Amino acid sequence: MTTNRKDEHILYALEQKSSYNSFDEVELIHSSLPLYNLDEIDLSTEFAGRKWDFPFYINAMTGGSNKGREINQKLAQVAESCGILFVTGSYSAALKNPTDDSFSVKSSHPNLLLGTNIGLDKPVELGLQTVEEMNPVLLQVHVNVMQELLMPEGERKFRSWQSHLADYSKQIPVPIVLKEVGFGMDAKTIERAYEFGVRTVDLSGRGGTSFAYIENRRSGQRDYLNQWGQSTMQALLNAQEWKDKVELLVSGGVRNPLDMIKCLVFGAKAVGLSRTVLELVETYTVEEVIGIVQGWKADLRLIMCSLNCATIADLQKVDYLLYGKLKEANDQMKKA
């Protein structure tokens, strides 16, 4: 059952198209008089207890099936070659089936910066087992309540999640990242997570892979909930009061380096990509995808140069305009 579900997730993730993307409602103000040479632009950033050379990473997607194994190997090769973080999909399938090797990418990619993922429904003992078996540089702990509720076989008991989060924060020996799955993390959740000791979150807003859409495609029910949650940029705007206390990672509908820059302008430490990279490895050879991802680094530098930003931190000084739904919501927030 798990294998079929994981393959369905891949299939439906690739087929869905979003008519709205909140990044399109942000315009950055160009600077006509440059201050820096292109080779002075520094893309490095810091989060989860370490310095990273580049402010983007391949976010959690898949595992738990033969198709998932194939995709994870491709993604690991891309990430290792490009020197970026790669986070596997939820390790729960391997916890249920010890023979599942679809997450085992480190042996063939020894220099890979590897993260892995587990659901908050799992007690900390399983999180510790995951870390022991995968040896990741960080552990994403995902919260996916709407997805669980829409899954016929999904979780129905949630009272333990907060105590689990407290346990993860205290006992997991590597940095943890509390991660949404495309519904947009709200500010109250960030506040509660902070009280439990969490210092890094992935807001993961609506606009990319929708697990509401995926589960409704599987069950044929409740498609009126396909657009549930906050868009990625809206979630990031909502989290502004927390950006000096909590490291904000952003994912959900990120398509290109310009979208990445817009996230960084609003205080993100780094940006995760899932479906964009999945589409690439399913369309092109691994070598071609490596070339595309390396090109993103060059594009980030040239955009930063045109905005007079030598560092990622400088981007938070960039002026911008908001339009449409994003402007309306932001105006409401200012009045509240």
From Swiss-Prot:
Requisite cofactors: FMN; NADPH; Mg(2+)
Residue positions binding Mg(2+): 148
Protein origin, superkingdom: Bacteria
Keywords: Cytoplasm, Flavoprotein, FMN, Isomerase, Isoprene biosynthesis, Magnesium, Metal-binding, NADP
Keyword Magnesium among record annotations: yes
InterPro entries attached to this UniProt entry: Aldolase_TIM, FMN-dep_DH, IPdP_isomerase
Keyword Isomerase: yes
Catalytic activity: isopentenyl diphosphate = dimethylallyl diphosphate
A GO CC term assigned to this protein in UniProt: cytoplasm
EC number assigned by the record: 5.3.3.2
Subcellular locations according to the entry: Cytoplasm
Chain residues that bind FMN: 60-62, 90, 117, 179, 204, 209, 253-255, 274-275
Example of a GO MF term: NADPH binding
SUPFAM superfamilies: FMN-linked oxidoreductases (SSF51395)
Binding site for substrate: 5-6, 147
Primary subcellular site in the record, as a coarse category: cytoplasm
One of the GO BP terms on file: isoprenoid biosynthetic process
Catalytic EC class: isomerase
Oligomer status and interactors: Homooctamer. Dimer of tetramers.
Family named by the database record: Belongs to the IPP isomerase type 2 family.
Function: Involved in the biosynthesis of isoprenoids. Catalyzes the 1,3-allylic rearrangement of the homoallylic substrate isopentenyl (IPP) to its allylic isomer, dimethylallyl diphosphate (DMAPP).
Name of the protein in question: Isopentenyl-diphosphate delta-isomerase
